[in-house]
Amino acid sequence: AMRRVRTLLEFGCEITVVSPEVCEELREKVLWKKKRYDETDLESLGNVGEASRFIFVLAAAAPEVNEKIVCDCRKKKIPVNNASNRDQCDFYFPGIAKDGDTVVGITSGGGDHRLAAKISAAVRQILRTIAV
């Protein structure tokens, strides 16, 4: 989940973390709700129209917590990404190759993260070569 949060922050997203703990690196960069998830975290988003600008990325240690959040998000039509279960992902995070204003995203549709990472590294190298 840390890689996903770093990527979202790099593109200017505002991140809220709901967790009893958060790593030091993120404390200054995110809004941290120091608590365990409960349904009221979604209720505070308002109606589905307002919630449509939100996504949820899950990385709880307990699979049952992730499954509960997936279920709650889907009831409100909020896109969700369960980092521990690709079958519970409404979207996937691409590998990113970035050079200046050029950004390329590579995904394997959740199937082969290593392949996507290798291709991302190759594209980064190509971008560096072109930029020279």
Whereabouts are the PLM-identified features?
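Adenine nucleotide-associated cytosolic modules
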Residues: 1-132
